[in-house]
UniProtKB/Swiss-Prot annotation:
InterPro entries: Alpha/beta_knot_MTases, RlmH-like, tRNA_m1G_MTases_N. This is Ribosomal RNA large subunit methyltransferase H. GO terms for cellular component: cytoplasm. Belongs to the RNA methyltransferase RlmH family. The lineage of its organism: Bacteria, Pseudomonadati, Pseudomonadota, Alphaproteobacteria, Hyphomicrobiales. Its main location: cytoplasm. SUPFAM superfamilies: alpha/beta knot. The keyword Cytoplasm applies. S-adenosyl-L-methionine binds at G108. Pfam families: SPOUT_MTase. The gene is rlmH. It is found in: Cytoplasm.
Length: 160
């Protein structure tokens, strides 16, 4: 199964981008042994529309353009399900074992994801009740994806 993250906004050069890339590379190395075929990150420029509904619609259209037909969508949303790391790993393993060809995690911009994308998502996931900057959320998501792979591999990285 392929994994992708489609995110609104671009990470600038610096510690966030370096950390995100480190977790992506670590996942690729660990995940390959578990039947995962890599992790791609797609960045989409934020819409410059003045009003929120237009901005969200433009960003949603740009995201949907990158989604293959049979991909499963996971919305990163503050209203989503709060999974612990083991539960998150079990979700990924279950989808892999069901031969889901691709799972795509969607991270909205400053206004969040459009209601249309939230409805299309098979699952909505939250990283707690707090609101996180989308750049920070991307790093946290990539870390959790890597952590999930280490849990599935029996690697000592996860020590809960």
């Amino acid at each position: 199964m392929r994994l992708s993250v489609i995110a609104i906004g671009r990470l600038k050069q610096g510690p966030e981008r370096e950390l995100a890339e480190r977790y992506r590379e670590r996942f690729d190395e660990t995940g390959r042994k578990l039947g995962f075929r890599g992790l791609e990150v797609h960045e989409i420029a934020e819409s410059r529309a003045r009003d929120v509904p237009t901005r969200m619609a433009e960003e949603a259209a740009a995201m949907v353009a990158l989604v293959p037909e049979r991909a499963m969508l996971v919305a990163m949303d503050e209203r989503g399900q709060n999974l612990d790391s083991i539960g998150f790993a079990q979700k990924l393993a279950g989808w892999r074992d069901q031969s889901v060809p691709q799972t795509i995690f969607l991270i909205g911009g400053a206004d969040g994801l459009s209601p249309e994308l939230r409805r299309k998502a098979k699952l909505s996931v939250s990283f707690g009740a707090a609101t996180w900057p989308h750049q920070m959320l991307r790093v946290m998501l990539l870390e959790q994806i890597y952590r999930a792979a280490t849990i599935l591999a029996g690697h000592p990285y996860h020590r809960a």
